[in-house]
Amino acid sequence: MADNKTTATELLERLHKMAIFRLSLGSKELFHSNFLEYLWDCDKESFKEIIRNLCGDNQVLTADQKYFISREKENFDVCIYHTSNNEEDGKAVYDVIIENKVKSIPYKEQLAEYVGKVADKKQEKSPAYLLLSLAKDFPDKEDEEIKDTWKVVHYGTLRDAIWAQEKWRSEPFVEEYCDFIKTLDELGAAILDGMDREYLFPNVEDYKKERLHDLYIKMRCSWFATALKTELGKNIDKRKIRIVSKYEERLPDCVNLNVAMNQGNGQIAAWICDRNMNTFEIVIQGDQYRHGINQIGIKKSKSKEIENDYYQVKENDRASFKHFVLNWLYGRLENLQDVNAYYFLNFLDDFNCFNSNQSDIRPESKKEKVYYFRKTKTPKAGPFDCYSDDYIYRYVSISNCTVHTLRDKMLNDILRIFYNLPDLS
């Protein structure tokens, strides 16, 4: 962990002065793969020793045969392999697979895909799988499939292993590289230090200058999602909590958690689906906390149009308001089965701990509020919004909400909708 006296600002300034850091910005993960290949070329035996130490297996890369290293071969970040004819372009038998996750979040599905790709080759012996991660914790880290197959190695550990090879210290760039990843490791710790007491993204602008804002956002989102998953596991069967890399991977009767960058903002999403894949979502995106409903096969409402781009409804007419929202969601009024869908969206009044932007609710008069439902795909600030005919959401601002409070709120909302899923059939 970073020294308490070394602030994130000081670490960013230290990185700024490193030429090797500037060179890494072109492709952060490919850069590290390239440097591993460079170390292999410097001294193969020392590199093999490092791999054995990191894998915790003294039998790796010990056979009396010629080994080769490659980057991006069959989409593996780095692989070490041998061939039956001892020629580099021969049929590869993989001995070590290395996956780099410097700025990205490891996902079980992606890692399982790599393992499956090797399994399809029906090798006599499985390779060693090494996952290099800057984040010490990520949502899928404790998954049994990952723990049984992949050796997760933190970049700080990689730095120590490289520096322990004294013969490498005189090689060009090795000292600079070790100093670079040591500083990056300390910065990663500083990014998360005291996070539970802070806002979710309070200092993102500080990282943009060094083009590290994506790293800052992803690490904090990953930490948040990991903590959220842990708390969910105390209330829901852990087999029903899934980490997914994209919306299309969600499954019914599960809490599908996603961490991503969306339009330059950090996103932490919980997608809960019924058997028809109608989806209720609880999403943090940037400084917004959203509840949304995405219904399959919805048709456009024939409600009265206003201003060419909006539907209008008055809140004081409660029956009309509910029917409008639900009719808009479901397409046909006669299909309405459960008004809980409306109450799922109507959550602003429960957010006393958040600073709701009251300007988002535009009053037509002092006595009643008028809501505008956007019909176009371009979002507009408002208490309700939509991107298409089948998706509506509502949001509040969370710019002044601590991570601890936000996590508890999201946890409670997920449990509420998971155990009381509205019927959209």
Model-identified regions with their sequence ranges:
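Acidic metal-coordinating catalytic centers involved in nucleic-acid phosphodiester chemistry
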Residues: 2-11, 15, 71-74, 80-253, ...
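A short acidic/basic microdomain associated with nuclease active sites
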Residues: 47-73, 246-248, 254-260
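Conserved short hydrophobic interaction patches
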Residues: 39, 117, 121, 328, ...
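Polyanion-binding interface signature
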Residues: 202-387
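Charge-dense, extended regions
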Residues: 384-425
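Generic detection of long, well-ordered alpha-helical segments
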Residues: 26, 30, 174, 214, ...
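Generic solvent-exposed, charged/amphipathic alpha-helical segments
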Residues: 37, 48-55, 115, 229, ...
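A structured, charge-rich N-terminal accessory region that forms the first stable segment of a protein
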Residues: 2-56
